[in-house]
Each structure stands twice: as C-alpha cells, then as structure tokens.
Amino acid sequence: MAVHKVSFVAHLLVLGMFLLLVDAKACTKECGNFAYGICPRSQGTPDDPICTTCCAGYKGCNYYSANGTFICEGSSDPKNPNVCPQFCDPDIAYSKCPRSEGETIINPTGCTTCCTGYKGCYYFGQDGEFVCEGESDEPKSCTTECDPRVATISCPFSGLVKINQECINCCNADKGCELYDNDGSLICTGGEPQSAA
C-alpha cells in the first residue's frame, strides 16, 4: 500500500514539474528575418533637441519643449506610422516614453524573433510590413552608482544586514530586498519599478 502512495505522489510531482516547464517561456534558437525594429524610447534633451512633430511622434510618448512644457502626445502608431510632413517642430525638444534607454530603430535586428524581441518593440519584415510585437522582457540596466542613503537592507533569504562597503541602489538590489535609511525608513524594495526622484 505504501508503494502505491509513493508512486501516486511521484506522479503528482512529475505532473507539477511538467506543468511548470510548459508554462515557462522558451524561445527557439532559430533566427528571424526582420528588416528592422522600432522601440519607442525617450529621446533628446533641452540642449540637444530632436527633430519630430506631434504627427510623427510615437503613441505613448509625450513631447516637451526645452523649458519642460508639455507639447503633445505622439499620434503615430509604430505598427502603422502616420504619413506626416517632413519638418521639425521647433517647439519640441525632447520626448519621454515608457522605455528610456537603448536604440529607437534597431537595424540590423540580428537573430531576433517575435519570441526573443522585446515587449513594446515592433518588428517589420523585409517588405516593410509589420510582423509582430516582441514577447520577451527587456533586461533591466542599472546604474552602478551607490545610493548614499542606504544604511541597512533586509532580504527575505538573509534577514537584516548592515551595509558597510557594499555598493547598492534601488535598481541593483535583489528582488524583494528592502532598503532602509539611517532612520529606519523604507527607501525602496528591489525588483519593483522606481518612481523618478
């Protein structure tokens, strides 16, 4: 009877592992054949303005003047861009988009496929037609600067630790780790989106 119970538990364990594997995202190693990709990203600065218009600007991106005044939200869908006049709006200096770092136009795309392409990036075939939006999360890039406010860190796996020579900030802290200042106030939790300070 004990053998049947062990066998049943073993089958449940194997089934659970199978379901985890099926649920996990695995991309094939085949290469895509994209001509280019578009990833709407923040561009320009008050001192180094971009050349665009509200018509040509990407949906989801906000456009600002050099003094920080909101001008407009872009109205062009990267999957089906607007046909717009070819001039620069002198009022627009920079944009703020959900994605901030990296190239806006990806060309060449290398071995990118729909599966390995980044979410929020749009990929186009050799004929210029929209193929797909990427499905993978883009790796987070963190600054290497130390946050001088951090005095202690509490991680679920290690407990409370005093920070001495360790260089840490809200971006590079392990997921779930809470960073505290000298007063014991929570600064942030690692692995969570941080608001711009």
UniProtKB/Swiss-Prot annotation:
- According to the record, the signal peptide region is 1-24
Cystine crosslinks: 27-115, 31-111, 39-121, 51-88, 54-72, 55-84, 61-97, 114-132
Tell me the ranges holding the sequence repeats. 24-80, 81-140, 141-196
The Swiss-Prot or TrEMBL record annotates one GO molecular function as: serine-type endopeptidase inhibitor activity
InterPro entries the record matches: Prot_inh_I20, Protease_inhibitor_I20
- What are the UniProt keywords, alphabetically? Disulfide bond, Protease inhibitor, Repeat, Serine protease inhibitor, Signal
Query: Which factors induce or repress this protein, as stated in its UniProt record?
Result: Locally induced in leaves subjected to different types of stress (TMV infection, wounding, UV irradiation).
- Where are the residues marked Reactive bond for trypsin as a site? 29-30
A Pfam family reported for this protein in Swiss-Prot or TrEMBL = Prot_inhib_II
Q: Which superkingdom is the protein from?
A: Eukaryota
| SUPFAM superfamilies in the record | Plant proteinase inhibitors (SSF100897)
Q: Which family does it belong to?
A: Belongs to the protease inhibitor I20 (potato type II proteinase inhibitor) family.
Protein name (record)? Proteinase inhibitor type-2
Q: Which organism is it from?
A: Nicotiana tabacum
